[in-house]
């Protein structure tokens, strides 16, 4: 989430609806030298083909592909791939670039599941231009090499990417406006390095094998879920479609476990379009969503916690942004501790940590930071209990918390939100078929990067217990 002024909101509501359809001229090219591109798939399995759609100021480009995990491992290299400068359509952000494929690769059978980064090079020497794109390789035999599936937050990558001029945010938009549709068929800005990579590096260094997928695989390949004991969400997992939720909630009801080492999770409902190559989200302008006037308001592309949708993310994760907010970000609790205060130290999640009631952990690496999720709480004898009035499951237990608050500008995103209400980042757990653990913060993995003893032990406890 990003705060914005009310004036920007009002401008966006007009411009998104009336300006975009009439602007059709191609956009200006970046200054030479340049190279950029995207893959036609977010994920694939060995034996399938992935195509690279490229544009460059040179007539050929170099391509190096590496698997990025505990180590960077080069798996493929090719020089002098024929290329050309491709037009950038005015609506590239929403409708895609429609560039031809410059190169198509069949994924070798020996490529392991993981995050793969392709580095593109145009020109030579110090004046060469470089760009990157990514794709994910799923396991050809789900669950064979790992009982743990990490699904990457690729919907959020796309939502924040403003390449082509627009994203789902106004703060970095070409015209200061907010889009309502974003395409994967354009160069994307990955957020993998910020949150998921520190988790992956720690996991692989400590003997935890992971299989990989992307957000949309929960929607279009839900059959893979049954092969795993534990599904992970790490970092900033903000944008979810209804089929994604349906399939993961069915998995949990059937006994599958989920660990949300993430925050601001499942905040906005999106609708997949173009067979998963685009996302629609009208956000705070829910009454301009075409579904609003059709009466099908359960699928409105707005906050999951909105009173018209009536499906708060708490029902899935145990917590939500409505009772969370920011910590050390957006002007909220900028001098806050950045750490969790323990409430129930005897829970198995804290085994081996030595933590006691009211003791804090994670502050060295500010594991409570940026965006946080919480639940409505009541305090009895110094201990917090969920009220369950916000959708948190009846078995949800609050294990630790830290204060958080919405930024004032965000209150306009929800038409029944009381201003200045304090929330919290909540670390908690519930069982409803399977077990669901939630960290309630985007920045949990930073504690793994910093090797915080408590964060490391808690993470081990969760992975060891829930992956069995």
Predicted regions and their residues:
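Bacterial N-terminal signal peptides that target proteins for export
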Residues: 1-11
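Aromatic-Pro/Gly-enriched surface loop or interdomain linker
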Residues: 55-71, 79-81, 127-224, 460
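Glycine-rich, aromatic-lined ligand/substrate-binding cores of catalytic
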Residues: 275-461, 465-466
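Proline/serine/threonine-rich low-complexity linkers at boundaries of modular beta-sandwich domains
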Residues: 26-34
């Amino acid at each position: 989430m990003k705060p914005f002024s009310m004036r920007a909101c009002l401008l966006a509501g007009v411009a998104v609806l009336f300006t975009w359809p009439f602007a059709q001229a191609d956009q200006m090219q970046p200054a030479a030298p340049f190279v950029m591109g995207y893959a036609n798939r977010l994920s694939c399995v060995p034996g399938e083909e992935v195509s690279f759609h490229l544009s460059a100021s040179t007539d050929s480009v170099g391509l190096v592909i590496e698997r990025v995990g505990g180590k960077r491992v080069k798996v493929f290299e090719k020089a002098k791939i024929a290329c050309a400068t491709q037009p950038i359509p005015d609506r590239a952000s929403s409708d895609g670039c429609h560039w031809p494929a410059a190169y198509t690769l069949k994924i070798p059978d020996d490529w392991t599941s993981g995050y793969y980064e392709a580095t593109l090079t145009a020109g030579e020497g110090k004046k060469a231009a470089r760009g990157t794109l990514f794709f994910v390789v799923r396991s050809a035999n789900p669950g064979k090499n790992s009982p743990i599936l990490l699904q990457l937050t690729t919907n959020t990558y796309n939502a924040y990417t403003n390449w082509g001029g627009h994203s789902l945010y106004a703060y970095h938009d070409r015209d200061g406006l907010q889009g309502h549709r974003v395409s994967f068929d354009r160069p994307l800005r990955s957020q993998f390095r910020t949150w998921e990579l520190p988790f992956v590096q720690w996991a692989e260094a400590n003997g935890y094998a992971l299989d990989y997928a992307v957000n949309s695989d929960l929607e279009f390949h839900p059959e893979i879920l049954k092969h795993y004991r534990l599904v992970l969400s790490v970092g900033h997992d903000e944008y979810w479609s209804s089929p994604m939720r349906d399939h993961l909630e069915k998995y949990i009801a059937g006994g599958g476990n989920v660990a949300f080492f993430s925050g601001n999770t499942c905040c906005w409902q999106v609708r997949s379009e173009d067979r998963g190559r685009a996302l629609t989200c009208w956000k705070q302008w829910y009454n301009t969503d075409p579904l609003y006037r059709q009466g099908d308001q359960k699928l409105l592309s707005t906050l999951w916690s909105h009173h018209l949708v009536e499906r708060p993310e708490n029902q899935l994760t145990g917590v939500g942004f409505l009772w969370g907010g920011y910590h050390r970000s957006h002007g909220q609790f900028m001098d806050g501790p950045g750490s969790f205060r323990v409430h129930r130290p005897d829970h198995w999640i804290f085994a081996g940590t030595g933590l006691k009631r009211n003791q804090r952990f994670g502050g060295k690496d500010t594991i409570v930071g940026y965006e946080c999720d919480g639940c409505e709480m009541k305090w009895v004898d110094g201990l917090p209990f969920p009220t369950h009035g916000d959708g948190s499951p009846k078995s949800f237990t609050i294990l630790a918390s830290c204060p958080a608050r919405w930024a004032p500008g965000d209150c306009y995103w929800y038409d029944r939100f009381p201003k200045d209400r304090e929330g919290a980042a909540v670390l908690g757990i519930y069982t409803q078929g399977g077990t669901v653990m939630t960290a309630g913060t985007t920045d949990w993995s930073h504690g793994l990067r910093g090797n915080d003893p408590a964060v490391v032990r808690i993470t081990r406890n969760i992975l060891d217990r829930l992956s069995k």
